[in-house]
Structures are given as C-alpha cells and as structure tokens.
C-alpha cells in the first residue's frame, strides 16, 4: 500500500469536492444511505466476522458492543446520513463582512479544510459519520480504523465509494488504509504535503502518539473523564435517574459517566439510592469516605479506589465514587483528574450551578442533564467526526462548521494600495 499515492489522490479529490455544488454532495449522501440499507446483508455478515474474531481474542463485552452492528443500528446510521443532507452546507457562506474606508468590500467565507486524516478504534459507525461529514463540507478523507473492525469497514468503504462514483464524485474522496501496520500510521502523520488535519479518536495512548509524532495539526477527540456532581440542594430521586442514564445507558460510549462526586451533606441518602438502583449492574470504586458508607449495604459490587482509578475512562459498568465537601472540592477534583469531556451538576442552587459551569474545564458542561448528550446528533449538528477535548481549533462535538476554515475575500473597483 502506497500512502503517498493515496495522499496525492486525496488532494486531487479535495479540489473537486471544494467546488462541488451542494446538490451533488447531497446526492452522494442520499445514495450512501440507500446503499447501506440495500447492502445490509453483506455489511452485517462482515460485522459477524469482526465479532467472532473479537470473541476469540477475548475482547471485553463493552468493546464488543462498540464493534457490533445490528439491522437496527444500520438503519440508524443510514438515517444519520440523511440527517446530514438536511443540514445547511456551510461551504461558501459568509461569516461576516464589512466595507473598508477605501471602498473594498471585505468578507470571511467558509471553505473546506482540504484532506482530513482520521485514526480511530473499534466503532464501525465512525467510518460513515466521518465520510458523510467530510463529504458535505467538501473535504477528502483518509481513514484508518482499528483492526477489530477490518471486515466491517472494508464493506462500508466499498458502499461509500460506489455511491461517490454514482454521484459523479471521485471515489478517492474517501480512502481507507487497509493494512493494520502501525508504521503506516506513523507515515500518515508526516504526510503534511497532502493531509491538512489529523483527528485521532481513541484512547490516551493514541492521542499521545499522534501529538508527539505528527507534523500535521492534530485535533484530539474522544478521551476524557466525565463527572457528575450531586449537590446538597439536588432533588435526589431525579438526580439518580440522570446519574443512571449517564452511566448505564451505553457505558462503552466516550460520554458515559466515569466518576460520581456527592456532596457530603446528602451522601448517606444518595448513596443508598445509588446502591438500590445499581446493585448487580455496576461495580463501584470508592475513595475512603464513600467506601465507608457503601460497605454497609448488601448486594453492592464494591472495591476501594487505587491510584489511577479516578484517571480511568472506564467504558464499562464501573463507576468511581467520591464524597466531597462542596462544589469547590468537586471542581478541584475534576481539574486534577482530566475533566475535559463532559461534566454535569445536579442541583437546585443557581449559584452552585454557575460556579460549576465557570470552573469546569470540560468541552461540554451540563446543569441537571445527562453527560450522554455530548453528541453531534443530540446537539443538532448531525453526526460528528469527533468530540474535541482541546481548545483549538474546535471544541466539543465537531459538526459541519468545525470541518471548515475560512478565506478572506476582498472585492473592489480596480483598487490599489496608496
């Protein structure tokens, strides 16, 4: 596999995509959605191969859930693509404009970034999400998925490329690095002649490797510890529902709850509710104060927290629990333990809510809402290419606008500079 050739093809495709009309891009998206449903048997058969290999390799059930495609999930993915069709195309839109004193009309106009390289692990739906958003914004993409979803991704990329050709767009608009060789990833990270942005979606190790080795700007997406703080003023019964949704609705998601912080004034009552709700489903990993309260209950899966536990993105039915004195201690804990993704406070106190919002360093902060809302579709952005946990160039769910840059456009009447 020659990555230089792929890069050259992607760059050429990016020029075509940059000037493709919205109608043509939407046509390609519509065909992708239809082809996903028309080829469901082949896609699900390929996914079965990936799941079988995962079981044989002893991959955790949480990770297997990330790999799994079902007919229902496939329909959902196709509908997500159709939702992207209905979103406004940001390419060519003016961000702002003004007329200068010299008579020049000056504006900033949204343009595609160019070629985007995305390195991701496990979830096959990411392949479609990335391709559809890049296509809508006129960007070519080079994808490198995890070896765990090799067969699924190959089938999905085949569907995408067929759809592109049917719509009259270059098949090289979306390319896939088939070999799992890590050396190819290292090579991709240095292809700054062809690739304009790298987005790694995975764990801390992948992010670190990309930041240290890439000569291309990197957007860090996905990893971060998510927290919920139950304040003393919270409606405890309703707070429990939010905590349960944050943790247990889909624990393998990157926006699932990792650490629960509970105000000491309500800790005995709330932890009793928590145990009653989560016994037999969730393992609790508790610091000393919380452990002292939780060990009194029967039927709880419980262990004492060890060093590093509160820095762990669990992605499973495990939850860190800590009792804190107030919102200030909650904020201090979050700052220490990589609160960069999604955090929520459950409270009926406006001052506590505002303090939490202002001190939380995460990309998405909620008041009385589940952390599970940090998602492009939930935010009305369509699908997402990543959830950026850094502060530049984008932050939070990266939808269409976050996949564009801008150019300055000046219009005048044969104007010269004096």
Curated annotation (Swiss-Prot):
InterPro entries: Ald_DH/histidinol_DH (IPR016161), Ald_DH_C (IPR016163), Ald_DH_N (IPR016162), Aldehyde_DH_dom (IPR015590), G-glutamylP_reductase_CS (IPR020593), Glu-5-SA_DH (IPR012134), GPR_dom (IPR000965). It is an enzyme of class 1 (oxidoreductase). Coiled coil: none annotated. Keywords: Amino-acid biosynthesis, Cytoplasm, NADP, Oxidoreductase, Proline biosynthesis. PROSITE patterns: PROA (PS01223). GO terms for cellular component: cytoplasm. Pathway: Amino-acid biosynthesis; L-proline biosynthesis; L-glutamate 5-semialdehyde from L-glutamate: step 2/2. It holds the Pfam family Aldedh. Its EC number is 1.2.1.41. One of its GO terms (molecular function) is NADP binding. Its main location: cytoplasm. Belongs to the gamma-glutamyl phosphate reductase family. Catalyzes the NADPH-dependent reduction of L-glutamate 5-phosphate into L-glutamate 5-semialdehyde and phosphate. The product spontaneously undergoes cyclization to form 1-pyrroline-5-carboxylate. This is Gamma-glutamyl phosphate reductase.
